């Protein structure tokens, strides 16, 4: 059994028996008077989103008018202490839930950024590929890189001009006419 004291105008002790059926079952006692909450039980069901609080109250001995007023005040402060404990538990649980949600959101944001980077990278590669294909179609770039092997003993010809057979005949005719006209003179 664990117990701790809740600070308040009068001293209270809160104990939780771990061998009880509910992990949220408490007994509140006031050391100044004989007032107790027995089997104070907090049930939180996440499936149905419901919270219930059950308790049994009792005082030991007979009460006179003054003791009755003390008992009422004690009950008030016990209720206040109980509400504080419940609020702390709820705040703790809500904090854990919000923390978990934050972690999930951070993971999701990271995945979204990775996908965006991958899409941008693929778009860049597709753009480069399309530009290269366009240049190949226009003949500005060879479609496949050609390996050039150099032979140091070979003679390099800087330029080669080909002439067609029609041009060759024309040249020959001009030469013959010019030579025959020079014979006539």
Swiss-Prot record:
Disulfide bonds: none
Primary location class: plastid
Compartments, as annotated in UniProt: Plastid, Chloroplast, Plastoglobule
InterPro entries xrefs: PG18-like
Comp. bias (Polar residues): 52-64
Coiled coil segments of this chain: 105-138
Biological processes, Gene Ontology terms: thylakoid membrane organization
Record keywords, A-Z: Chloroplast, Coiled coil, Plastid, Transit peptide
Superkingdom of this protein's organism: Eukaryota
Chain positions covered by the region annotation Disordered: 48-67
Stretch forming the transit peptide: 1-56
One GO location term (cellular component): chloroplast membrane
UniProt-listed PANTHER family: BNACNNG14650D PROTEIN, OS04G0513000 PROTEIN
Protein name as annotated: Uncharacterized protein At4g13200, chloroplastic
């Amino acid at each position: 059994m664990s117990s701790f004291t809740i600070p308040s105008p009068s001293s209270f002790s809160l104990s939780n028996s771990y061998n009880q059926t509910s992990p949220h079952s408490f007994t509140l006692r006031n050391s100044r008077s004989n007032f107790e909450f027995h089997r104070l039980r907090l049930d939180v069901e996440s499936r149905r989103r419901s919270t219930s609080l059950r308790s049994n109250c009792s005082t030991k001995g007979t009460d006179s008018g003054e003791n009755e007023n003390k008992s009422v005040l004690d009950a008030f402060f016990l209720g206040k202490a109980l509400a504080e404990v419940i609020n702390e538990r709820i705040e703790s649980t809500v904090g854990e839930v919000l923390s978990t949600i934050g972690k999930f959101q951070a993971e999701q944001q990271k995945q979204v950024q990775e996908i965006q980077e991958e899409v941008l990278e693929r778009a860049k590669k597709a753009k480069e590929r399309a530009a290269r294909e366009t240049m190949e179609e226009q003949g500005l770039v060879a479609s496949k890189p050609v390996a050039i092997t150099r032979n140091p003993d070979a003679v390099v010809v800087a330029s080669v001009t080909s002439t067609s057979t029609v041009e060759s005949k024309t040249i020959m005719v001009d030469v013959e006419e010019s030579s025959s006209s020079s014979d006539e003179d």
